[in-house]
Design a protein with these regions (language model features):
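N-terminal export signals
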Residues: 16-34
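Hydrophobic alpha-helical bundle signature of multipass membrane enzymes
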Residues: 36-198, 220, 231, 238, ...
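Residue-level micro-sites within transmembrane alpha helices that shape
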Residues: 13-15, 28, 162, 205
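Interfacial helix-loop-helix junctions of multi-pass membrane proteins
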Residues: 191-222
Length: 256
């Protein structure tokens, strides 16, 4: 099997394109992803535990669902253009959304961290998607057409919120690596889930379940030998040192 170095040499002979900085970066990210995948390989999460922590969605027509609906209706009534604009900033499940928490453009500055988190999140994604499919809760704007979301509509199930899972898990994993930025990372993690309610894409109970599931999944990952081995990777440690070098006074204010 060719190594990253041999692949780069072969590709350079085949095309002038790879001589560009963009191509070199793409190749570097591919190689780092290949490095990160073995670290997360064979990681098994306790699916039953995660399902129990997520719990069940409120039954249709129940008082709990009525409370969910009342919150969504109230938020829609007082939704401002500023709130809508802010929710769009955390639309994508991409590591860059945490850049403001650490004061560095994460996607460019930390390819090893990005690749590693992506690999470790795969079993988390698999777990919540299975629960979502099993529960089959329809989105609030489908059940109640008077609700008009301010972010793009989605056709997947509503419970639990996948965004809440991702933001919660990612915030916990980053906080384990960068405890100095824990509070700021957790703030972004909470806001990423809350935005799904603010814009009417999820019931509050969807997001609460996703946050519980995501936090516990992260704890399981952090306790695993795979994560501990990943933490010791020299490439990752070098990236974390760069992030720690950003002084606290240089960190941007967090959106409120």
């Amino acid at each position: 099997m060719p190594t990253c170095a041999s692949h780069r040499s072969t590709t350079l002979r085949r095309s002038q394109w790879v001589a560009s900085p963009l191509a070199a970066l793409a190749l570097q990210q591919t190689c780092l992803a290949a490095q990160a995948e073995p670290a997360a390989a064979e990681l098994k999460l306790d699916q039953r535990r995660l399902a129990a922590i997520a719990g069940l969605p409120p039954a249709p027509g129940s008082a709990a669902e009525a409370a969910d609906l009342a919150i969504l209706e109230w938020l829609q009534r007082f939704r401002s253009p500023e709130i809508v604009a802010t929710t769009w900033l955390l639309l994508d499940r991409d590591l860059d959304v945490f850049s403001s928490a650490v004061g560095t453009e994460l996607g460019k500055a930390t390819p090893m961290l990005s690749a590693g988190l992506h690999a470790f999140m795969e079993p988390v994604n698999s777990a919540y998607r299975g629960i979502k499919q099993q529960q089959g809760r329809i989105r609030p704007y489908v059940a109640y057409p008077g609700l008009v979301p301010c972010l793009p509509r989605e056709n997947t199930g509503s419970f639990p919120s996948g965004h809440a899972v991702w933001f919660s898990s990612t915030a916990e994993l980053l906080a384990d690596l960068l405890p100095e930025r824990r509070e700021r990372l957790h703030y972004v993690g909470r806001q990423g889930g809350a935005n799904r309610v603010l814009c009417g894409l999820h019931y509050p109970s969807d997001v609460e379940a996703g946050q519980r599931l995501g936090a516990d999944a992260a704890l399981q990952i952090i306790a695993s030998p795979q994560w501990q081995a990943f933490r010791q990777d020299p490439a990752l440690r070098a990236e974390l040192e760069l992030l720690r070098a950003v002084p606290a006074k240089a960190l941007p204010p967090m959106l409120r």
